[in-house]
């Protein structure tokens, strides 16, 4: 006998969901930087219940164990964004401890011991082992000199802690890579005002008997070519990724010449916001296992070094990062619409895929999960923009008759970054309550080639905003969402998109800004070295900067705001300081517009603590429900919304 079930007609936004803010916070276990070590595999795993501490895990034949117990926090602060915070080789791990920036060494189940001296003002990242000389080679960032900005170098760190500068003179360095025979060192460097996805240089030097780097020569790159991930093949041939063709493709350097290895309208690289990323690895001298992105979706494949042919490999993933290999075993981080990011091992010899770690150990029932639809739509000036659209999904509820759902448009951070289709409980939190979501890959996003990425050059606050506005209008026009209940949210650079959309366009009814940029001039004044000239690329060259800053900074156009807003700000944020949010809050207060402001102590750029995730999500939901006059659940904590009628 079949029992008929029916959904309860309930206003969108008022649906009850098992995906609570606490579930989102508990499920958000960051996984990063897998690293094979023979038959073992290491990776970093976040502890939201411990203030966001990152710990080093190792899995081998004896099981899984933690190498860096509390209070150790395996994070680098080089460039502020870090990455490349540890190295695992031969059962020994070297790592950067966030609290003091010193390098530590730990072996098996022993206690970590400090390698470098205390209180030097030095930070380290992106290590490579130079075993023959009893040292590591790393990127060092020196904050001890009292200058406006730190000094970046390539540095040798002896096993005894002694530090020796190997390469200096450029503003930034990354990816030191030692050849298999230990005789050559490749590295990347770049200069202000460039970011590493604008222009980098690949250098090669010989390692002298005393360990110094000599006979240095420029291999490829410059101001108009972005190179990333230099790697040596097992036979000692240098490979790298370059966007000289308009796409981040694979190249190799042999016989004093650079050759394209696999030319394709696809991205084999990603922006170097963090150290230590890996989109390809060598299975052998003849085969490269790689992740590549086409139209914002990742794939796994094998490139032949003989003819450059690409053979796709079937995986369940649409977002693939940090590809590593040991023998036939590929290790990667993968995600998909119904798969949260997970650490997986794939045996190229044919054994079943094995998942070593889940970012969300316990997933909600799939009936509560909205599966995104990749869409493209027309935007301003004849452009085509791209996004992932999520319709509301909940097996227990349906909209009221003739009701269309409210829409939340998300502008990703960066802004040189991208939205993916990977399962994010923070998105499902909204869709399972009756909100539709549009996650926009606006012009300037990665995953669509250099030309699309460069659409944001001198156009930040314009192109990104236009593409978000166009996406909302497109969905309203085709009858997918309620044109009178359009919302926009974003963090960091996406926060500028939110504020600009509300200041310069009359489309969205409310917005949420997470540590968003409101004053471009202030961002310039307060920014750290890595992003100190990023604005020159995003907005205008120095001679026109001040005029453009004033023209595009929402703080100077706050009189145009007509919509309620909620702001979230970490008080320890060094990337986008609290003043950026506070000035906008004061401006809305002065106009008597509805505004809410939540500050979080001990949080920086991005919220790591579970309590912070819960507080902000619940506050944002409460804010939207109050703005739209939807009944507020009794168990949802109230927040103060100034100037909003009861």
Residue ranges, per PLM feature:
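Conserved beta-propeller blade repeats
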Residues: 26-40, 73-93, 120-136, 170-185, ...
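Short loop/turn segments that connect beta-strands within beta-propeller blades
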Residues: 60-62, 107-110, 158-161, 207-210, ...
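Cap/lid segment of the alpha/beta-hydrolase catalytic domain
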Residues: 193, 359-484, 491, 524-526, ...
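Active-site-proximal cap/loop segments of hydrolase catalytic domains
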Residues: 442-646
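A flexible loop/linker signature enriched in serine peptidases of the S9 family
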Residues: 45-55, 74-80, 95-103, 117-123, ...
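A short beta-strand motif characteristic of beta-propeller blades
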Residues: 19-25, 65-76, 112-117, 162-167, ...
């Amino acid at each position: 006998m079949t029992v008929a079930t029916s959904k309860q007609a309930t206003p969108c936004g008022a649906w009850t969901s098992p995906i609570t803010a606490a579930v989102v916070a508990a499920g958000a276990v960051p996984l990063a930087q897998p690293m094979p070590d023979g038959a073992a595999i290491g990776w970093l795993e976040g502890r939201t219940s411990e203030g966001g501490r990152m710990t080093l895990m190792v899995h081998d034949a004896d099981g899984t164990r933690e190498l860096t117990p509390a209070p150790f926090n395996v994070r680098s602060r080089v460039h502020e964004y870090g990455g490349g915070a540890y190295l695992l080789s031969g059962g020994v791990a070297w790592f950067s401890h966030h609290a003091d920036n010193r390098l530590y060494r730990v072996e098996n189940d022993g206690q970590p011991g400090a390698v470098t001296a205390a209180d030097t003002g030095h930070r380290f990242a992106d290590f490579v082992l130079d075993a023959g000389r009893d040292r590591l080679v790393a990127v060092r960032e020196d904050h001890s000199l009292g200058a406006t900005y730190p000094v970046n170098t390539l540095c040798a760190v002896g096993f005894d802690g002694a530090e020796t500068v190997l390469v200096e003179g450029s503003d930034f360095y990354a990816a030191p890579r030692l050849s298999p025979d230990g005789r050559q060192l490749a590295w990347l460097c770049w200069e202000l005002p460039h970011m590493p996805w604008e222009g980098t240089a690949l250098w090669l030097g010989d390692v002298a008997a005393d360990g110094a780097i000599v006979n240095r020569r420029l291999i490829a790159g410059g101001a108009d070519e972005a190179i990333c991930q230099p790697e040596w093949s097992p036979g000692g041939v240098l490979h790298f990724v370059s966007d000289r063709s308009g796409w981040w493709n694979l190249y190799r350097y042999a016989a004093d010449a650079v050759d394209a290895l696999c030319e394709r309208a696809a991205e084999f690289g990603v922006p170097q916001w963090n150290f230590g990323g890996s989109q390809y690895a060598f299975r052998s001298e003849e085969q490269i296992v790689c992740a590549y992105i086409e139209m914002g979706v990742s794939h796994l494949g094998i490139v032949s070094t003989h003819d450059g042919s690409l053979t796709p490999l079937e995986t369940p993933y649409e977002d693939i990062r940090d590809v590593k290999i040991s023998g036939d075993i590929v290790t990667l981080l993968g995600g998909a619409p119904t798969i949260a990011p997970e650490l997986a091992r794939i045996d190229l010899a044919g054994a079943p895929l094995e998942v070593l770690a889940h970012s969300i150990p316990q997933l909600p029932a799939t009936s509560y999960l909205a599966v995104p639809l990749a869409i493209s739509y027309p935007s301003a000036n004849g452009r085509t923009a791209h996004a992932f659209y999520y319709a509301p999904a909940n097996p227990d509820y349906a909209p009221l008759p003739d009701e269309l759902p409210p829409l939340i448009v998300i502008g990703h951070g960066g802004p040189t970054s991208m939205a993916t289709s990977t399962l994010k409980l923070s998105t499902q939190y909204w869709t399972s309550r009756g909100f539709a979501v549009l996650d926009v890959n606006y012009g300037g996003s990665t995953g669509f080639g250099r030309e699309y990425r460069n659409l944001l050059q001198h156009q930040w606050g314009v192109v990104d905003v236009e593409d978000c506005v166009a996406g909302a209008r497109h969905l309203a026009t085709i009858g997918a969402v309620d044109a009178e209940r359009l919302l926009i949210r974003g963090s960091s650079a996406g926060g500028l998109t939110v504020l600009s959309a509300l200041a310069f366009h009359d489309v969205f009814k409310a917005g949420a800004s997470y540590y968003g940029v409101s004053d471009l001039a202030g961002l310039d004044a307060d920014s750290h070295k890595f992003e100190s000239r990023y604005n020159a690329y995003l907005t205008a060259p120095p001679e026109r900067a001040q005029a453009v800053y004033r023209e595009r900074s929402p703080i100077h156009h706050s009189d145009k705001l007509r919509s309620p807003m909620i702001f979230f700000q970490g008080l320890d944020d060094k990337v986008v300081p609290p003043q950026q949010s506070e000035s906008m809050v004061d401006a809305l207060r002065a106009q008597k517009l509805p505004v809410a402001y939540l500050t979080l102590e001990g949080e920086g750029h991005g919220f790591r603590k579970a309590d912070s995730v819960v507080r902000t999500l619940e506050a944002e939901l409460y804010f939207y429900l109050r703005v739209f006059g939807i009944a507020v659940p009794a168990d949802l904590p109230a927040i103060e919304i100034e100037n909003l009628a009861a």
